[in-house]
């Protein structure tokens, strides 16, 4: 079996199976031997933090990134992430679009260049969080609080002290649909 460079981790709810299937179809189309993706479905018995920790524990890649089951990735997502990881960074930056019902999607950028989480001129700037590819050893050190809301922000706050070297990914590679808006 080939060594895995990247583990893509997807906690999912059974009620989102159609959306998750669309996502996994796209992942399967892009998959390489150096990348694994893992799903952890349930019907809401566990908190999202618990599911993220379980997936993290099962991951074997040098790097991990989470993808939310109701979001979507760009057709070149894996290629761009893997190219960024060639430089052996602590993490890779991430640019995406937020589809929140506004006339036009908003841009978000996750990078170690930004301290904290803030918005300016219609762009959301964030320190890396669960959506960014980060070294698995750092993600394992900090883990997620076993809560259902805010676990991503807590993870982001905890992991930032370990992230010193970043590879920049150009272009939009992630499509975020808050509160299940992709299903509507």
Describe each model-derived feature in a short phrase:
Residues 169-184:
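Active-site donor/metal-binding and catalytic loop motifs
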Residues 22-37:
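Short, acidic, metal-binding catalytic loop of nucleotide-sugar glycosyltransferases
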Residues 43-59:
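Glycine-rich, basic loop-to-helix element that forms the pyrophosphate-binding segment
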Residues 99, 114-134:
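A recurrent flexible, glycine/aromatic-enriched loop bordering the glycosyltransferase active site
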Residues 149-155:
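Acidic donor-binding loop at a coil-to-helix junction in glycosyltransferase catalytic cores
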Residues 68-72:
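The conserved acidic donor/metal-binding loop of glycosyltransferases
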Residues 76-107:
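Conserved donor NDP-sugar-binding/catalytic core segment of glycosyltransferases
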Residues 64:
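Short aromatic/hydrophobic "clamp" motif used to bind/position activated sugar donors
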């Amino acid at each position: 079996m080939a060594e895995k460079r990247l583990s893509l981790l997807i906690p999912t709810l059974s009620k989102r199976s159609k959306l998750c299937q669309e996502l996994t179809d796209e992942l399967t189309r892009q998959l390489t031997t150096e990348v694994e993706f893992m799903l952890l479905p349930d019907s809401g018995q566990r908190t999202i933090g618990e599911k993220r920790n379980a997936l993290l524990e099962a991951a074997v890649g040098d790097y991990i990134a989470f993808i939310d089951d109701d979001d979507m990735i760009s057709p070149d997502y894996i290629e761009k992430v893997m190219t960024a990881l060639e430089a052996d960074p602590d993490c890779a930056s991430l640019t995406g679009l937020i589809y929140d019902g506004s006339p036009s999607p908003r841009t978000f950028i996750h990078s170690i260049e930004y301290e904290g989480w803030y918005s300016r001129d219609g762009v959301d700037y964030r320190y890396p969080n669960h959506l960014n590819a980060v070294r698995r050893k750092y993600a394992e050190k900090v883990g997620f609080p076993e809560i259902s809301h805010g676990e991503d922000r807590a993870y982001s706050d905890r992991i930032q002290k370990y992230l010193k070297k970043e590879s920049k990914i150009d272009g939009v590679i992630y499509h975020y649909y808050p509160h299940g808006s992709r299903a509507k």
